[in-house]
């Protein structure tokens, strides 16, 4: 909450919100800790903690014992530092040379894989009289960022030349198909990465942290654990694949809304843009104040469901920017202001990001990450609830009588 902003009544916001259960996240973290033992854990909180809200999630994970936090961008690292986070922060995606000052000024550990990154970081460290810490990113086979494993010795020479302004404290890579235990390429990547690390050591570089294991590898590939692990999606309650061994995590985020309008339409009446759905009977239709700007994929139109009074209600017509319509004909008593579960559980039914992803031909990661910025996050913990909204400051500036 911004300085000087008072707590606002929850009903001042549109009745669409996400609940983030920080106790569930703590239990997921403990399940990972039980799996890997004393190994340090780098909790991945990039992309606004997969849509859950990076600041509050990072605070909870730091309290749970995460030694490291992983982000993609320097800007994400700066946000965490300025919010008081003290854990070590790794920039998994590296940085642009022009951001070298930002990296050092906020005590961030940068991934490096380009010579100009070393030059910029070394110059910035020299101006400050400090030592920059880096992790070398190695491409062991995923083919995106990173020094190709066979070229590690050549890059090692650049790292040695950059000492003492730059010290390599870690080396890491990323797995391409660890979510499929039958895929032999994971073993190929592990071997390639180990070979690259040995080549670094022969050049006189001895990083303390060697890491490769993502969520899938934590579950089913112990040879990839090495000296640190990097859980991502399992922190948020979703195993990366049904092909992996069972793992005791539970979804952290629920997405909820309320019915704001109900009407009965006659057979032959169409709904929404493009008239993609037409009633074939007398139908009760409920309108929900949630749309694709809030994160619902348009592909859910005429495919997906929500839960109303613990029962599935089909989405009818196209998802609009701000509105979604559902058929509640078969749900007796469904009425105005009823709570609607978009993601979550009710009445023994569960709708998860995995189910929504299947309807939308995508993956749970995308469903979670696309949750809209205008959706308030309500953080639930033992100490109560905390509401975080992009509109908080604007609403708090209203005359006091308006918000009380």
Q: Where are these predicted regions, by residue range?
A:
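Active-site anion/phosphate-binding pocket segments in diverse small-molecule metabolic enzymes
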Residues: 1-26, 30, 34, 40, ...
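Active-site-proximal beta-alpha core segment in soluble small-molecule metabolic enzymes
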Residues: 9-12, 16-20, 24-27, 34-211, ...
């Amino acid at each position: 909450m911004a300085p000087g902003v008072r707590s606002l009544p929850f009903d001042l916001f549109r009745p669409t919100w996400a609940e983030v259960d920080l106790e569930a996240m703590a239990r997921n973290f403990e399940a990972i800790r039980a799996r890997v033992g004393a190994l340090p854990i780098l909790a991945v909180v990039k992309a606004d903690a997969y849509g859950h809200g990076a600041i509050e999630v990072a605070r909870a994970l730091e309290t749970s014992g995460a030694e490291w936090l992983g982000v993609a961008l320097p800007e994400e690292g700066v946000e965490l530092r300025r919010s008081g986070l003290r854990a070590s922060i790794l920039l998994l995606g590296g940085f642009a040379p022009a951001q070298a000052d930002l990296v050092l000024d906020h005590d961030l550990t940068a991934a490096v894989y380009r010579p100009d990154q070393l030059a910029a970081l070394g110059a910035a460290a020299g101006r400050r009289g400090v030592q920059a810490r880096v992790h070398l990113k190695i491409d062991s086979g995923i083919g995106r960022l990173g020094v190709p494993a066979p070229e590690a010795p050549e890059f090692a020479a650049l790292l040695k030349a950059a000492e003492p302004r730059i010290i390599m404290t870690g080396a890491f890579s990323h797995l391409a198909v660890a979510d499929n235990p039958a895929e032999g390429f994971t073993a190929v990547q592990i071997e390639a990465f180990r070979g690259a690390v040995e080549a670094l050591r022969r050049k006189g570089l001895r990083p303390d942290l060697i890491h490769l294991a993502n969520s899938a590898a934590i579950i089913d590939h112990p040879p990839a654990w090495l000296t640190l692990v990097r859980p991502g999606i399992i922190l948020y309650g979703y195993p990366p694949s049904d092909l992996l061994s069972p793992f005791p995590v539970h979804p952290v985020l629920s997405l909820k809304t309320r019915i704001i309008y109900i009407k009965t339409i006659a057979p032959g009446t169409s709904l929404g843009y493009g008239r993609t759905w037409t009633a074939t009977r007398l139908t009760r239709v409920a309108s929900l104040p949630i749309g694709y700007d809030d994160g619902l994929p348009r592909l859910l139109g005429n495919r997906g469901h929500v839960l109303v009074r613990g029962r599935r209600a089909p989405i009818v017509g196209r998802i609009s920017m701000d509105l979604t319509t559902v058929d509640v004909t078969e749900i007796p008593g469904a009425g105005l202001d009823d709570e609607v579960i978009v993601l979550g559980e009710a009445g023994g039914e569960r709708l998860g990001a995995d189910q929504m992803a299947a309807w939308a031909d995508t993956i749970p990661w995308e469903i979670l990450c696309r949750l809209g910025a205008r959706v308030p996050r309500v953080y639930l913990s033992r100490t109560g609830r905390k509401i975080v909204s992009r509109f908080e400051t604007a609403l708090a500036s209203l005359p006091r009588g308006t918000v009380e």
